[in-house]
């Protein structure tokens, strides 16, 4: 009834998600200790198929989160275990008009068009600055930065269920994706 007869053959396992907010409203060192605790139970069951443990990283430019999580996970950890993680996540969404009123997915002017594309370029700054912090704790670059949530996020379309976060895509979104992928 419960479980699965065979292993799922996972490639990546995120130890938490958005723990700084909806994933627990945790402060960095509390989450880092929880990550240290729970990653212990994520084991490699086949030598040819390792599971990459991904620690919950920052939301946008919360560089303090990155620094504190890495500091805590690396404390009392053998150097060769690089904080008991293989990756550190990062989330960044383009909100042309800001978080509270994100703006329409389809009704926008040239100014908002260019503002959106410019905000997509901010991903490069985020990668560089979070990467610099990661290098302080992991100079051998054993921990990968995993940008696991990104793109454009607009106000929910009128008449749709707000819990489903439906938004229509346009050429602007294709360009945001192209800019972002080019940075990677």
Predicted regions and their residues:
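Catalytic-core region of carbohydrate-active enzymes that cleave or remodel glycosidic bonds
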Residues: 61, 72-83, 87, 110-184
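N-terminal catalytic cores of secreted or lumenal carbohydrate-active enzymes
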Residues: 1-109, 128
């Amino acid at each position: 009834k419960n479980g699965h007869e065979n292993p799922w053959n996972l490639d990546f396992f995120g130890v938490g998600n958005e723990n700084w907010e909806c994933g627990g409203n945790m402060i960095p060192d509390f989450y880092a200790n929880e990550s240290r605790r729970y990653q212990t139970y994520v084991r490699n069951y086949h030598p040819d198929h390792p599971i990459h443990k991904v620690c919950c990283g920052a939301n946008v430019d919360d560089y303090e989160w990155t620094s504190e999580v890495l500091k805590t996970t690396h404390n009392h950890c053998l150097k060769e275990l690089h904080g008991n993680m293989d990756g550190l996540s990062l989330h960044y969404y383009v909100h042309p008009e800001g978080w509270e009123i994100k703006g329409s997915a389809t009704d926008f002017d040239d100014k908002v068009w260019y503002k959106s594309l410019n905000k997509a370029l901010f991903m490069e700054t985020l990668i560089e600055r979070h990467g610099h912090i990661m290098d302080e704790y992991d100079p051998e670059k054993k921990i990968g930065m995993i940008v696991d949530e990104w793109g454009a996020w607009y106000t929910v379309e009128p008449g749709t269920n707000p819990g489903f976060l439906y938004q229509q895509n346009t050429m602007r979104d294709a360009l945001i994706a192209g800019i972002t992928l080019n940075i990677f």
